Amino acid sequence: MRAFLLASLASLPAVNVYAHPTHNSRGLTRRAVDLDAFRPKVPTSYTNATAVQADPEIPTLARRADPEQVASELVAKILPDAQFRLVSDHYVGTNGVAHFYYKQTVHGLDVDSGDFNVNIGKDGNVFSFGNSFYKGKLPAAPTLKRDTEAAANALRSAVNVLSLPMSAESATAVPKEGSDAFTITQTSGAVKEPEARLVYVQDASGNLKLAWRVETDIQSNWLLTYVDAEDGSQVHAVVDYAAEATYEVYPWGISDPTEGERVVLTDPFDRQASEFGWHSDGTTEFNTTRGNNGLAHTNWENLSSGYLNFPRPSSADLKFEYPYSLEETDYKAYANASITQLYYTSNAYHDLLHTLGFNERAGNFEINNNGAGGRGGDLVYLNTQDGGGVNNANFLTPPDGQPPRMRMFIWTKTSPSRDSSFDAGVVIHEYTHGLSSRLTGGPANAGCLSSIESGGMGEGWSDFYATAIRLKPADTRATDYPMGAWIEGDSRGIRNFLYSTSMETNPQVYTNVDQYIRVHPIGNIWASMLYEVLWNLIDKHGKNDAAKPDFDANGVPTDGKYLTMKLVLDGMALQPCNPTFVSARDAIIDADKALTGGSNACEIWRGFAKRGLGAGARYDPTTRTDSFELPEGVC
């Protein structure tokens, strides 16, 4: 990922370029420009369900048959002077909560950092809401026009300031039909032609600035760069979309080759989640590692287009069974086994997440949504043995309807080197970046984990799901887990601390976030809190070791492991754009209230309070406040 810091397993992710975990300085790849320095700094708030019920004004909103009207009236009531528009990606989650997303507008232009999400409960009333609308003095109406030369110059500024590996000297902007954006032609080095449009964005001082939002997909990074529209040289912020018959594979639950043997699985797909199976998109049957959810292949040359022509196995009878040896020194010799493993793990995880609520309406990854809502056309491009780097992996998540990319690299920390596609924890970590990016702020807004704290939580959610899924039947709350131990060749893994409920093994608390300016160590703290919640709920409800959950008549997972995974997922959909630890905690508590009536509040609060995120915890970007107290009467 060259001229700047890349988000990846082993490097420190830039705004939404995400990757596998990394242990501080080990495996760090640096660029000339640090994208973390350009992360947006936008204040956000989350009003949880308890606060909504206590507010005498909010319940006065008339209950109506149309929840969209209730949501719109709330936004107008909270911010009566604001202009806004409803984004088209609203949906009803599997817990019955409807999610509506609004974008602030000023002088007819979007405020890209101004988002308002409203959650409407099953009873038709406001459940909770999040808000990052700009509340300061509005600038005068712009005199600048949507000028083609200015749009092209904005791209040149982005290339120069960020040292992007592309050429824009001859760039020419052309109005995009049916849109107020410009397509910029006559460039080289980008996967697709860049685009630019005028928007407003908050600068580092909290002022609203007119800017060109320049979108560039340069393979390793997919960037939104906000270039000041007045002087054309200052970059205010950067968002990166970059923090799968029969298959002979390491089966679900086997995290890496040290934990078990490869087996041959027959038709392991879940028909409810993948109604076409794993080798059809509903119109065409495929005899290769291609289907509705993903397209898997090698990418040794680090190419950025032509994915359909990349090397992948083909089998007329759909028998994807290929040899693999840990002793093999030439990783290309087992490429087909690697492709098959990545295709299997990714599809299996797609199906599990669909069962838990990450479905078509919520913005999951499918070519054909089959009338189930959301936008299709976005299966995952699954690159194994990717030639774009080593000792790393990443997942690039654009908005719903555009296909994301997973790039799995070879790791050279051992001899022979190791293929990260055989480490299920790494694959799940990467795919979970797509989950958290699509759910937070709505499927059409992939830039809602762009602050340093929310980006860190993105890493934490990815570690959490990778860890929860690999729990073994004999595990107890005394069981500790590393992240990336096999691929790194180090039993400590690549995180600062093991995931453990022991405060001696892992002493991290909320205020430790103050000492970090990178997302992976922040994510280690967030995932440590979720690990506490996980074991509290397992101790209460037991642990289902099957590959998918059982649900009661109300759609609640019957065991603690899958219940925690469900609540964390639902919390992502409730929380505001760019959440903090505090607002994300509140969203998980609200998710339990929506799903179970709040029957697990005590266990959830105990898990967070143990590590300093109790009732009195306070967020400040430089000086956070610990609290180990529980709310009165919660237990």
From Swiss-Prot:
Catalytic site residues?
430
Any one GO biological process:
proteolysis
Q: Which cofactor does it need?
A: Zn(2+)
GO MF entry, a single one: zinc ion binding
- Pfam families named in the record: FTP, Peptidase_M36
Q: Where in the cell is it found?
A: Secreted
Presence of the UniProt keyword Transit peptide in the record: no
One GO location term (cellular component): extracellular region
Which InterPro entries does the record cross-reference, listed alphabetically? FTP_domain, Fungal_virulence_M36, Peptidase_M36, Peptidase_M4/M1_CTD_sf
Induction entry: Expression is controlled by the prtT transcription factor.
Which controlled-vocabulary keywords does the entry list?
Answer: Glycoprotein, Hydrolase, Metal-binding, Metalloprotease, Protease, Secreted, Signal, Zinc, Zymogen
Write down how the cofactor binds this protein.
Answer: Binds 1 zinc ion per subunit.
What are the boundaries of the signal sequence? 1-19
Which residues are involved in binding Zn(2+)? 429, 433
Q: Which Gene3D superfamilies match?
A: 3.10.170.10, Neutral Protease Domain 2 (1.10.390.10)
**In the UniProt record, does the keyword Metal-binding occur?**
yes
As for what it does, the entry says: Secreted metalloproteinase that allows assimilation of proteinaceous substrates.
Q: Tell me the protein family, please.
A: Belongs to the peptidase M36 family.
Q: What is this protein called?
A: Extracellular metalloproteinase MEP
Organism per entry: Leptosphaeria maculans (strain JN3 / isolate v23.1.3 / race Av1-4-5-6-7-8) (Blackleg fungus)
